[in-house]
């Protein structure tokens, strides 16, 4: 199998990278009716598998779970979750032949084995669904020509997909049809019905492509969403302790600081996050972010280049074949870092304190979000896609760190995201060490002293923040998400 993207000519590559259309709510007037009365079989019962299935069943669809024989015989976690929630469970051989839509929600590294097992069992004219296009785009999986291949990709972890549905809402979602596999021209109807059944149509749906979803998703998770948070956590903790801060306090300031800061980002973009600072602190955060962007731009561009070329995917798949040696080594090393092993702080940190003493962290968020967005757009990805894969998902990832530090983040994200995170953070930490050595008092761990500011400078900085393209597209997209619940901010 060959990387699908690399088999396309330049015009086709650009067309698929740039496919992105915000769909109107009237396009979902029929809800999930196209799949009513049809058999939907989900392969895999992890966070996405279970929670999408619960939503789809509540939307009136016929949902069952196909699991490997060993998982059923040994009553593994996937079997327990499906059966405890009242779903029909069976082997591939029992359920796949009757399925009208088979949805593969297993981890990326299992996709080829799963598709190899289920494809011969699928009836003529059935559909195969994904929530991430890695197997199609990067692996280059060949699917039978009579099978329709679609994607519905919620831009949130599976738990959020369920919680927002229960509130009568949903999460922003990308949908796509694989252009090589739409023999009956029904792919979009299937994808729309599936998205509606999960509740995604209530929060905004982008019609995208497998290529655009994969390339933007990989870029976001490697850089700002996971890699920048990991690198920032390690660098900021070490800096605080080096300057005499109690390790327990330093750990809490960082662990819960990302979540608190990015909650403002979620509600009002970079503008609101920066507005939480005093005027002197805002000017300093802006200056720091510009320095960071200049330093990190080549690293962000390298990650985007390696994602576009397929270099990243081939390296990761080589590690899969080597029993995840690199991944497991990096995971173990991360668990032994000073940040991960620091004691817990029992005192309370007020919400504003996270902003006042986290000017550098805010600068890192601003720089990382803007760089990821700019680098994607420069590579042909449309602004709406770039927004979802940079700014939108950041509060959700920050929330995982608030639960159990970097360990929790790396457990919750996919192995693909975790591998990319380590590649980025292992390069970013040494890259930023000279910058960290030049920080001033008030940049981290202490509030910047109040003082006079130059009105013209403040005006220009405010204009620069608010006029960035991500702020303009973000304001539009957040208009569809006003009902999404706040992420709880810890004390």
Swiss-Prot record:
Coiled coil: none annotated. NADP(+) binds at residues 45-48, 68, 76, 78, 108-110, 158. Involved in the biosynthesis of branched-chain amino acids (BCAA). Catalyzes an alkyl-migration followed by a ketol-acid reduction of (S)-2-acetolactate (S2AL) to yield (R)-2,3-dihydroxy-isovalerate. In the isomerase reaction, S2AL is rearranged via a Mg-dependent methyl migration to produce 3-hydroxy-3-methyl-2-ketobutyrate (HMKB). In the reductase reaction, this 2-ketoacid undergoes a metal-dependent reduction by NADPH to yield (R)-2,3-dihydroxy-isovalerate. Residues 15-208 form the KARI N-terminal Rossmann domain. Belongs to the ketol-acid reductoisomerase family. GO terms for molecular function: ketol-acid reductoisomerase activity; magnesium ion binding. This is Ketol-acid reductoisomerase (NADP(+)). GO terms for biological process: isoleucine biosynthetic process; L-valine biosynthetic process. Substrate binds at residue 414. NCBIfam families: ilvC, PRK05225.1. Gene3D superfamilies: N-(1-d-carboxylethyl)-l-norvaline Dehydrogenase, domain 2, NAD(P)-binding Rossmann-like Domain. Its EC number is 1.1.1.86. The keyword Signal does not apply. GO terms for cellular component: cytosol. Keywords: Amino-acid biosynthesis, Branched-chain amino acid biosynthesis, Magnesium, Metal-binding, NADP, Oxidoreductase, Repeat. PANTHER family: KETOL-ACID REDUCTOISOMERASE, MITOCHONDRIAL (PTHR21371:SF1). Mg(2+) 2 binds at residues 217, 389, 393. Residues 209-344, 345-484 form the KARI C-terminal knotted domain.
């Amino acid at each position: 199998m060959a990387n699908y993207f690399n088999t396309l000519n330049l015009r086709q590559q650009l067309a698929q990278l740039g496919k992105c259309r915000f769909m109107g709510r009237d396009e979902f007037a029929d809800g999930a009716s196209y799949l009513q009365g049809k058999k939907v079989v989900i392969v895999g019962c992890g966070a996405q598998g279970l929670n999408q299935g619960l939503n789809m069943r509540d939307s009136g669809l016929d949902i069952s779970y196909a699991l490997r024989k060993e998982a059923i015989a040994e009553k593994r976690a996937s079997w327990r979750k499906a059966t405890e929630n009242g779903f029909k469970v069976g082997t591939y051989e029992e359920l796949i032949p009757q399925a009208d839509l088979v949805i593969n929600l297993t981890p990326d590294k299992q996709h080829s084995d799963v598709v190899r097992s289920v494809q011969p069992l699928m009836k003529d004219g059935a559909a195969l669904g994904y929530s991430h296009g890695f197997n199609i785009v990067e692996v280059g999986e060949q699917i039978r020509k009579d099978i329709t291949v679609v994607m519905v990709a919620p831009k949130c972890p599976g738990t959020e997909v369920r919680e927002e549905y229960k509130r009568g809402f949903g999460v922003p979602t990308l949908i796509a049809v694989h252009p090589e596999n739409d023999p009956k021209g029904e792919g979009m109807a299937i994808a729309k019905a599936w998205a509606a059944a999960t509740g995604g149509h209530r929060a905004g749906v982008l019609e995208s492509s497998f290529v655009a979803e994969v390339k933007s998703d990989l870029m976001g998770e490697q850089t700002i969403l996971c890699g920048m948070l990991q690198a920032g956590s390690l660098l900021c903790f070490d800096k605080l302790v080096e300057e005499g801060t109690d390790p327990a306090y330093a750990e809490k300031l960082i662990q819960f600081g990302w979540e608190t800061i990015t909650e403002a980002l979620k509600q009002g973009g970079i503008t609101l996050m920066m507005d939480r600072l005093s005027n002197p602190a805002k000017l300093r955060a802006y200056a720091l972010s510009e320095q960071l962007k200049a330093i990190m731009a080549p690293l962000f561009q390298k990650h985007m280049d390696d994602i576009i070329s397929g270099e990243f995917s081939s390296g990761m798949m080589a590690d899969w074949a080597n029993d995840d040696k690199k991944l497991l080594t990096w995971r173990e090393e991360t668990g032994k870092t000073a940040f991960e092993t620091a004691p817990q702080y029992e005192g309370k940190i007020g919400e504003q304190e996270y902003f006042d003493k986290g000017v550098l962290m805010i600068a890192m968020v601003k720089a990382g979000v803007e760089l990821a967005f700019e680098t994607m757009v420069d590579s042909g990805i449309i602004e709406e896609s770039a927004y979802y894969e940079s700014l939108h998902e950041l509060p959700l990832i920050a929330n995982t760190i608030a639960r159990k530090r970097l360990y929790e983040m790396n457990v919750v994200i996919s192995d693909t995201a975790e591998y990319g995170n380590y590649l980025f953070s292992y390069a970013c930490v040494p890259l930023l060490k000279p910058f960290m050595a030049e920080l001033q008092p008030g940049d981290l761990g202490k509030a910047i002293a109040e003082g006079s500011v130059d009105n013209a400078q403040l005006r220009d900085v405010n204009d620069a923040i608010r006029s960035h393209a991500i702020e303009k597209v973000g304001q539009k997209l957040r208009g569809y998400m006003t009902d999404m619940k706040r992420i709880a901010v810890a004390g």
